[in-house]
């Protein structure tokens, strides 16, 4: 069988899983997770069968895209720091196995398939070290392969950018609120909804040195009256990071925005045939 196989290693899989191996047969994908001194490495393999030598370049690109879609799916599921290293591209033809490093190797395989001789160098892989952290309470690996269409990549990157701020001891919920709202502003269809309105007002409150627009001022007069003051006859508000009441308000609407944004992104993923 003429087979093309891409092998990668995924690092910093922060969610612990009960199983060490998953087979997603529909996609010809295998994932094996190794735990080493509190760190995790995901050995990932994706295969395409019946690939003629002339089609290696095209199918390689497809396998790389499928691998990136898998990584985005894992990121959505909570592995916010996961990253990959492409280790090896293998091509099998009539019992022979070739490691592909570059265009010359592909040309060598094509030439060899025509019965001509061509010098071919096999690839030797360097050893890699992972430096992630493992949490407690293992969960099952997904029943279906996590998959996010690449046209939705920007939403996953925004989600992970926001969720990585959870890892700092400082409070960055104001910054998280702004990031979540980027998703809401684009994907939310019901912008007249009261919760969306309140999230937007909270976002406006933390986004400006001095907030003086009517909607956020009216919102704050109800939710946080102490933040509103009058200057030169105009009502204004200023976000203070050291005020516990201000932080509590932002935390409340950051949480609401997070839930809403993740739900909207999941709907988009399913709409375009993905799975998380």
Regions found by a protein language model. Give the residues of each.
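Charged, non-catalytic interaction/linker regions at domain boundaries
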Residues: 1-175, 263, 271-272
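Amphipathic, oligomerization/interface secondary-structure segments
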Residues: 2-3, 138-276
């Amino acid at each position: 069988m003429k087979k093309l196989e891409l092998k990668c290693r995924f690092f910093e899989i922060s969610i612990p899983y009960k199983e060490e191996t998953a087979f997603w047969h529909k996609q010809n994908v295998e994932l094996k997770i190794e735990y080493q001194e509190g760190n995790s490495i995901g050995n990932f393999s994706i295969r395409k069968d019946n690939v003629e030598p002339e089609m290696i370049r095209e199918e390689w690109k497809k396998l790389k895209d499928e691998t990136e879609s898998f990584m985005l799916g894992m990121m959505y599921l909570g592995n916010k720091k996961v990253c990959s290293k492409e280790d090896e591209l293998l091509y099998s033809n009539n019992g022979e196995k070739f490691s592909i490093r570059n265009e010359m190797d592909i040309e060598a395989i094509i030439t060899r398939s025509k019965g001509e001789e061509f010098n071919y160098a096999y690839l030797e892989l360097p050893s890699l070290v992972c430096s992630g952290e493992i949490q407690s309470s293992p969960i099952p690996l997904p029943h279906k392969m996590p998959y996010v269409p690449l046209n939705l990549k920007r939403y996953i990157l925004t989600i992970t950018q926001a969720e990585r701020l959870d890892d700092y001891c400082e409070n960055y919920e104001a910054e998280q609120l702004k990031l979540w709202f980027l998703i809401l502003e684009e994907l939310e269809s019901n912008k007249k909804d009261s919760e969306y309105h309140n999230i937007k007002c909270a976002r406006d409150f933390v986004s400006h040195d001095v907030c003086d627009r009517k909607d956020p001022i009216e919102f704050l007069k109800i939710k946080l009256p102490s933040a509103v003051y009058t200057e030169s006859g105009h009502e204004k508000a200023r976000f203070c990071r050291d005020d516990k009441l201000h932080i509590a308000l932002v935390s409340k609407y950051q949480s609401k925005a997070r839930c809403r944004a993740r739900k909207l992104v999941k709907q988009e993923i399913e709409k375009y045939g993905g799975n998380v």
